[in-house]
């Protein structure tokens, strides 16, 4: 892991970045992530399901909760990464740690797809004390992860309505009725479990979690599904077309 940190810091130095935040997350804020988004595990060697890694120029630390204290101590031993035990009085907040280890005017980076707006606001407020800048548009880990697993592409299938309880048409109609009541023209869905429910869509992108990585925009006449289209089975395609759901590539949401 020390060699990985050296490589990562080299990439950070190229962009004049003083600190890098690597959460355990994906663009959908999923609790358990697929291997493509397991960047924190790749860099730290810690395999627990929850944790945030911060890499600074001369130090690094990983925050995790009480479920993983013993595991993290073992897996981080000799890595050059300090363990920060969430909930302990002596454990600083992530943003406070960064402020303490950065000089005024330096830059803090993170993959903006993986951080919620609320968390970004918390960081921004704390960073004002030293006028730290935030960089959100570079995936630094991707630069050094030469054998990074590909995005999942498991075949999709429709969950039978006798188990789902309602058809896609019925669910869309209910949501559109709520949108009309709220005078909303569009509803953006980023949570993959919500999309799985709405479209009765299932896949095997994440172990033990039968979902597909996708985005969805619902409008008053139908919607748009953003997903790797090559993985859609014919039954799913026919269902979506029938319900006026356009299909576009996953990255097209941006």
Regions found by a protein language model. Name each.
Residues 1-254:
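Terminal domain-start leader segments
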């Amino acid at each position: 892991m020390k060699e990985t940190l050296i490589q990562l810091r080299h990439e950070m130095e190229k962009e004049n970045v003083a600190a890098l935040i690597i959460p355990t997350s994906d663009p959908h804020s999923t609790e358990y992530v697929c291997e493509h988004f397991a960047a924190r595990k790749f860099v730290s060697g810690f395999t627990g399901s929850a944790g945030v890694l911060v890499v600074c120029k001369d130090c690094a630390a990983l925050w995790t909760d009480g479920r993983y204290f013993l595991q993290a101590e073992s897996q981080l031993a000799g890595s050059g990464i300090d363990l920060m035990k969430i909930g302990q009085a002596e454990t600083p907040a992530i943003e406070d740690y960064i402020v303490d280890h950065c000089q005024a005017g330096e830059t803090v980076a993170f993959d903006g797809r993986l951080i919620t707006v609320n968390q970004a606001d918390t960081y921004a407020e704390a960073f004002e004390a030293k006028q730290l800048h935030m960089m959100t548009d570079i995936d630094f880990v991707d630069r050094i992860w030469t054998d990074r697993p590909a995005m999942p592409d498991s075949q999709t299938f429709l969950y039978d309505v006798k188990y789902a309880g309602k058809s896609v048409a019925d669910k869309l109609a209910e949501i559109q009725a709520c949108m009309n009541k709220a005078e909303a023209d569009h509803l953006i869905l980023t949570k993959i479990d919500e999309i799985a429910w709405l479209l009765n869509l299932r896949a095997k992108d994440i172990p033990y979690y039968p979902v597909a990585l996708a985005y969805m925009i619902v409008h008053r006449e139908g919607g748009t599904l953003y997903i790797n289209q090559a993985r859609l089975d014919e039954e799913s395609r026919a269902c979506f077309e029938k319900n006026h759901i356009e299909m576009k590539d996953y990255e097209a949401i941006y």
